[in-house]
Amino acid sequence: IVLHQRGSHVPYGALLQPQDKVFGEANIVDKYDNTIHKTDQMIQTVFEQLQKQPDGNWLFAYTSDHGQYVRQDTYNQGTVQPDSYLVPLVLYSPDKVVQQAANQAFVPCEIAFHQQLSTFLIHTLGYDMPVSGCSEGSVTGNLITGDAGSLNIRDGKAEYVYPQ
């Protein structure tokens, strides 16, 4: 099962119910934090439902397609600011073999890339595909096509590559 939620997008909190606005709405950071709180609640609900599965044959994976650069006077996505591309990655399975494979693939990494997660999931589903490493990856600029350039990260060093 794949769940894709709206999550934390502008206008922050517009889709939340009043009881979900636990940080108030005094400023943009409070509004953004409300959306994070709602995401945390969703993650908890999904995780609790998975734990009720009797066979324990599941893998919970949570990540985001992008982060948000949020300050009082600036908020956006799709930039090459680390806040825009460093996103959470949570993996959990009650299956010890899957846990061991996840630890082997991700624990050595300071940064994991979506390509690495994708190949890990494909491999875990039983397909013959090696899991990508975490020594290099790319982040597209503000256009997913790459027409605005990309940030290439290799061994912890980032270099912006402009399109030809």
Positions of the model-derived regions?
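Catalytic domains that recognize anionic headgroups
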Residues: 1-164
